[in-house]
C-alpha cells in the first residue's frame, strides 16, 4: 500500500512508499474516487481534493489527466493546481508508466 511522507508542509513532492497504513491499492490505476480524494487530502490539498470528488476522478482518470485538465478542468486556483500537477499527478503517471512497461 502507499503512504505519503507528511514532513513536507509546502504541498511539494512527497515521498510515496509501500505501506499498509492508508488502505489505498499501490497502483493508482486501481484507486477509487475516494482513494484519489484521500491521497490529495493527505498531501495537504484538503480544499482542492473536493474538486476530484465533484468531477468523479478515479485512479484511471487521474492517470489520463493532462496539465490543462488540472489547471482548467478542475477549476482550481492556479498555484495549487500547478503543485498538484507537477508534484503529484505527473510523478504518479511517470511511476505508473515505468512500472507497467515491460
Curated annotation (Swiss-Prot):
This is Sterile alpha motif domain-containing protein 13. CDD domains: SAM_Atherin-like (cd09583). Residues 1-29 are annotated as: Disordered. It comes from the Eukaryota. InterPro entries: PcG_chromatin_remod_factors, SAM, SAM/pointed_sf. Residues 31-99 form the SAM domain. PANTHER family: ATHERIN-RELATED (PTHR12247:SF139), POLYCOMB GROUP PROTEIN (PTHR12247). It comes from Mus musculus.
Amino acid at each position: 500500500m502507499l503512504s505519503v511522507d507528511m514532513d513536507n508542509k509546502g504541498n511539494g513532492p512527497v515521498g510515496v512508499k509501500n505501506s499498509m497504513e492508508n488502505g489505498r491499492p499501490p497502483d493508482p490505476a486501481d484507486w477509487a474516487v475516494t482513494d484519489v480524494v484521500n491521497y490529495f487530502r493527505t498531501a495537504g490539498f484538503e480544499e482542492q481534493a473536493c474538486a476530484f470528488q465533484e468531477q468523479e476522478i478515479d485512479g484511471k482518470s487521474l492517470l489520463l489527466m493532462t496539465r490543462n485538465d488540472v489547471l482548467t478542468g478542475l477549476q482550481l486556483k492556479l498555484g495549487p493546481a500547478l503543485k498538484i500537477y507537477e508534484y503529484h499527478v505527473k510523478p504518479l503517471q511517470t511511476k505508473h508508466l515505468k512500472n507497467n512497461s515491460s
